[in-house]
Regions:
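Switch II (G3) loop of P-loop NTPases
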Residues: 1-14
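Structural signature of beta-strand start/N-cap positions in the alpha/beta core
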Residues: 2, 24-25, 56, 84
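WD40-repeat beta-propellers
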Residues: 2-4, 37, 44-46
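Generic enzyme active-site microenvironment
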Residues: 3, 29, 60
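Short acidic active-site motifs
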Residues: 11-15, 37, 95
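Conserved Switch II/interswitch segment of TRAFAC-class P-loop GTPases
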Residues: 22-42, 52-55, 64-70, 91
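Conserved P-loop small GTPase signature centered on TRAFAC-class small GTPases
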Residues: 53-148
Length: 148
């Protein structure tokens, strides 16, 4: 399992596509006490879906320990997405383990059963988990002894 955390920093924006490559799940986190991060979620989600249209996504509202009223707000954009949504506190640990378990379960299921129109998943299955590994690599590996 590889976990990438860009902390929403703009300096990582150009690197985002490299993080999406080979992803089987995504946890998107916004700060429930700062509306700007909720607004940015729309940008992050759209960008991620451009690169990974099918992977499962869980959206998280963090920092509920700072203002418990945030759990009573309406988050229409997230409701419209129809993706799992939870509240967490990284400071006191509320729901943190649950979120990682849920994401891992979704990612494992996605990897085992990718959508039929997810051609990248099919290509990666042919290549194996690493380039040059897997059934296709065994058939095409050149040991140098054969002539072309």
């Amino acid at each position: 399992v590889d976990i990438w955390d860009t902390a929403g920093q703009e300096s990582f924006n150009k690197l985002h596509p490299s993080y999406y490559y080979g992803a089987h799940g995504c946890i998107m986190v916004f700060d429930a006490t700062r509306k700007i991060t909720y607004d940015n979620l729309k940008i992050w989600y759209t960008e991620m879906r451009t690169h990974c249209p099918h992977i499962p996504v869980i959206i998280i509202a963090n920092k509920i320990d700072l203002d418990p009223r945030t759990t009573k707000r309406s988050y229409k954009y997230i409701e419209d997405l129809k993706v799992p949504f939870n509240f967490v506190s990284a400071a006191d640990g509320t729901n943190v383990v649950k979120i990682f378990r849920d994401c891992l379960d979704l990612a494992i299921d996605y990897k085992a059963n990718p959508p039929k129109d997810d051609f990248m998943a099919e290509v990666m299955d042919l290549l194996g988990d690493d380039i040059g590994v897997g059934p296709a690599a065994k058939e095409t590996r050149d040991d140098g002894d054969d002539e072309f």
